[in-house]
Structures are given as structure tokens and as C-alpha cells.
Amino acid sequence: MELRSALQSVCRTTAAAASASARSSLAGRHAFSTSARFQLQPPPNPYVSGKSRIETLRAALSNRKPAAGAAAGGSPGATSASSALPPRPPTANDSPWSIVDAINKDSNSSTSSSSSSSSSGGALYSSSKPSPMQTWNETDFETRHMAPQQELNIRLRPSTGRTFYVSGHQDFAGALKLLHRTVAANKVKKDVRLQRFHERPALKRKRNLRERWRARFKEGFKAAVNRTFELKNQGW
């Protein structure tokens, strides 16, 4: 019985100690998280206006003493350090082209120091020259850099002579004359007249025979006349 009571007292003591440590740890964690939550600061504002940046840079440049570099001596290191200073920030009264002119000046000075031949090619667009966006012409760009689109001539049926393609060296009047000549050679008017009215098969057969005999008579007559002139030229 004494051993049993001793074991029970030891178990009670161990359980009480474990529960007390757990409560203290929970309270400490809660107190730590609460204090940490109260200690959090609001995040800084990442946005800084351009005007404030310009004012800060201007104040930093004004606080610098340019005489310190000159007192160090005329060494090349001092000149390079002075040339490496950032440019003066633009003010509200400066024109937008002042920055471009400054860039042109810097590029010209760098190219002229490296080689005299490339000094003229380093300039960008200045205020005296128009901007490339001001002189942009889409039609002129397409005519100079894009191939002209070829018109598709799809021949799904025999040509009727109603279309005539005019080249660049031909005028409108000459094109109309060539069109009328092509229409007459293809007998377009005759075909249109025959298509407008219905023609009986017997009349069509007679017309074809008549036209065939007329064409043969015309060709035979021309051949006889040509033969006569050939014999006359030969001295007969």
C-alpha cells in the first residue's frame, strides 16, 4: 500500500508539473505573439514622387563642394571623378529637348575622344530636327519597304475581253482604245447580243454555216489578192 501511494503521488506530481509547463508555454507564446503584433510598424510607402526625388538629388548636388576635387590636384583621377558626377536634374522650366541635347553632347564628346571619324555619327535627334514620329508616313513606308500586292487573275472560264490591265507607262485614253480593240477582236458585242435573245437550233446551224462560208470567202479572196501582187512583183 505504501508503494502504491508513493507511485500515485509521483504520478500526480509529474502530471501537475507537465500541465503547469504547458500553460506557461502557451501563455508565453500568446504574450510573445501579442507583443510582436503590437510592435509591427506600418510598411513604408514604396512610391516616391518624381518631384521629391529631383529635390533630393538637387540638395545632394548643392551640398557637394566642387573645390575639393580641384584642391586634390590636376590628376586624371580627379577629372574622371568630376566627369562621373550625375548630370543636373531637369527643372520645370527646361524644355523636353534639353535632355536630348545633353545626350547628344555627351555622345558626341565620347565618340570624338575615341575616334575623329565617328564623331559625326553619334548625334541623336535634336530640337532643330523633327522627331521620327512627327515625320512618319505609313503610305510612304509601305511603298518603300513592302512589296506590292499582286492581283490574283483567276481564270475559271475563257476570257471575254472585258478586262485589260494598264501598265504604268500607259494613259487612260490609250487603255480605253486597247480595251475597245480587244473587245472588237473577241466579238464580245456579238456574243452579248446572242445571249440576250433565244435562238432556235435550226437558225443557229444556218448562222454558223453562213459565217463559216463568209470567213472562207474572205480568206480565199485575200489569198488571191496576195498571189496576184506576188506575180506582179516577179514581173509577170
Swiss-Prot record:
It is found in: Mitochondrion. InterPro entries: Mitoribosomal_bS21, Ribosomal_bS21. Keywords: Mitochondrion, Ribonucleoprotein, Ribosomal protein. One of its GO terms (molecular function) is structural constituent of ribosome. One of its GO terms (cellular component) is mitochondrion. Residues 107-131 have a biased composition (Low complexity). GO terms for biological process: translation. It comes from the Eukaryota. Coiled coil: none annotated. Residues 65-136 are annotated as: Disordered. Component of the mitochondrial ribosome (mitoribosome), a dedicated translation machinery responsible for the synthesis of mitochondrial genome-encoded proteins, including at least some of the essential transmembrane subunits of the mitochondrial respiratory chain. The mitoribosomes are attached to the mitochondrial inner membrane and translation products are cotranslationally integrated into the membrane. PANTHER family: 37S RIBOSOMAL PROTEIN MRP21, MITOCHONDRIAL (PTHR41237), SMALL RIBOSOMAL SUBUNIT PROTEIN BS21M (PTHR41237:SF1). Belongs to the bacterial ribosomal protein bS21 family. Component of the mitochondrial small ribosomal subunit (mt-SSU). Mature N.crassa 74S mitochondrial ribosomes consist of a small (37S) and a large (54S) subunit. The 37S small subunit contains a 16S ribosomal RNA (16S mt-rRNA) and 32 different proteins. The 54S large subunit contains a 23S rRNA (23S mt-rRNA) and 42 different proteins. This is Small ribosomal subunit protein bS21m. The lineage of its organism: Eukaryota, Fungi, Dikarya, Ascomycota, Pezizomycotina.
